[in-house]
From Swiss-Prot:
Membrane-spanning intervals of the chain: 6-26, 71-91, 96-116, 125-145, 162-184
Primary localization: membrane
Gene Ontology BP terms: glycerophospholipid biosynthetic process
Record EC number: 2.7.7.67
Entry-linked HAMAP family: CDP_archaeol_synth (MF_01117)
Cofactor(s) in the UniProt record: Mg(2+)
Keywords: Cell membrane, Lipid biosynthesis, Lipid metabolism, Magnesium, Membrane, Phospholipid biosynthesis, Phospholipid metabolism, Transferase, Transmembrane, Transmembrane helix
Its biological purpose: Catalyzes the formation of CDP-2,3-bis-(O-geranylgeranyl)-sn-glycerol (CDP-archaeol) from 2,3-bis-(O-geranylgeranyl)-sn-glycerol 1-phosphate (DGGGP) and CTP. This reaction is the third ether-bond-formation step in the biosynthesis of archaeal membrane lipids.
Protein known as: CDP-archaeol synthase
Pathway(s) this gene product operates in, as recorded in its UniProt entry: Membrane lipid metabolism; glycerophospholipid metabolism
Compartments where found: Cell membrane
Family statement drawn from the similarity comment of this UniProt entry: Belongs to the CDP-archaeol synthase family.
Length: 189
């Protein structure tokens, strides 16, 4: 039962796990924020925003597009494998809406985390514990729940969600450590 729950959790999240890794490999190009900063805006209590970049150089259109495409393609490939695996473990097929939501949601979560990092004065690559490990999970799940509600409810049962929120930080730290060891990242987180 536990092994099947873990297998379903990993299978269902693979289209969300892969995009940020592919974005690192395919990155470069024009930053999403175009190099812009938030000018100082104030309200009656003082400074609301700072002059840091909106997102930073690490969030590019190319990385976002390639990452999203990779997640969707992976979901379509998993759909081809699913009939062979489903007899052993009850893994789901991915409707296209779920595939896109998982992949793009992962990218969007990472983009939102970058925005939060800049607002809290963290530089590109700086650690942001908790947010770094779960940003993409929360947004990809939320977006999937909105655009593929029936599939989401059938797939992401409470035990599967628990497995995702326990396993993801471990997988995230492990894969980032490997990417750092191979020189693909400047930081091990």
């Amino acid at each position: 039962m536990v092994a099947e729950t873990v297998a379903i959790a990993v299978w269902a999240m693979l289209p969300a796990y892969v995009p940020n890794n592919v974005a690192v490999l395919a990155g470069g190009g024009r930053p999403i924020d175009g190099g812009r900063t938030l000018d100082k805006l104030t309200d009656e209590d003082g400074v609301l925003y700072d002059e840091n970049r909106i997102l930073g150089d690490g969030k590019t259109w190319r990385g976002t597009a390639f990452g999203t495409a990779a997640g969707v393609v992976l979901a379509l490939l998993l759909n081809q494998l699913q009939p062979f695996v489903a007899g052993t473990v009850g893994v789901p097929q991915f409707p296209i809406a779920a595939a896109v939501a998982l992949a793009f949601g992962a990218m969007l979560g990472d983009i939102l985390a970058s925005f939060l990092k800049r607002r809290t004065g963290r530089q590109r690559g700086a650690a942001f514990p908790g947010v770094d490990q779960l940003d993409f999970v929360i947004v990809s799940l939320a977006l999937t729940a909105i655009v593929a509600t029936g599939w989401f409810l059938a797939t992401f049962t409470l035990p599967v969600l628990v497995a995702i929120f326990v396993l993801t930080p471990v997988l995230h730290v492990s894969t980032n450590g490997l990417a750092y060891a191979f020189g693909l990242k400047d930081e091990p987180w």
